[in-house]
Design a protein with these regions (language model features):
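Phosphate-end processing signature that detects enzymes handling 5′-triphosphorylated RNA
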Residues: 1-178
Length: 178
């Protein structure tokens, strides 16, 4: 099997919770802004969180999909409000292979993170825990700073609906709101 180069992105973010009043104020500020550098976009987002047999791992793993199209395998490590993330693009076919328990392509990859994930799935018994769907609002301030807020969050245990790749509208019909 021929291995291809994988485009991997690693970054750090600072997180905090905001109140409804802070969110409303930020949204109004962007709606009224005349600056072309300041804008706001909304994306439908789906996340599938994985859990292992041992909770001692400093990392969290999950699928992340925007617009029902772009799928990423994410590795996250949190230290207080600072979050380090690494994201690797996957095809939906590769994502479905993981959900079906076919992990061989992870081991065959040239990407060390995918190789280590093979062992997380096989040895640490990493498995899907729950799906989270939301609308992600991105408030772009400048080329160095975005404020990101998730709204209309719906969480569903994976066992209740195993079709992670269903379209966004279908997925929002079930689950519990947060």
């Amino acid at each position: 099997m021929k291995n291809t180069a994988i485009e991997k992105l690693s970054y750090t973010e600072v997180t905090k919770n905001i109140s409804q009043a802070e969110y409303d104020q930020t949204q109004e500020e962007y709606i009224l802004s005349k600056s072309p550098d300041k804008y706001m976009i909304s994306l439908p987002v789906k996340v599938l969180m994985f859990e292992g047999a041992e909770d001692s791992s400093p990392f969290t793993y999950y699928f992340y999909m925007e617009n029902d199209e772009d799928l990423y395998l994410m590795q996250r490590k949190r230290n207080g409000s600072v979050v380090d993330k690494t994201k690797i693009p996957l095809t939906k076919e590769q994502g479905q292979k993981i959900l079906d328990g076919d992990y061989q392509f992870l081991l065959d990859s040239d990407e060390p993170l995918l190789n280590s994930l093979y062992f997380q799935f096989t040895v640490n018994q990493l498995h899907p825990l729950y799906k989270k769907e939301c609308t992600r609002k991105i408030f772009h301030q400048n080329r160095f700073l975005d404020e990101i807020v998730d709204i209309h969050i719906v969480r569903t245990p994976f066992e209740e609906d195993k079709d992670f790749f269903a379209t966004h509208d279908k997925m929002l019909k079930g689950g519990t709101k947060n």
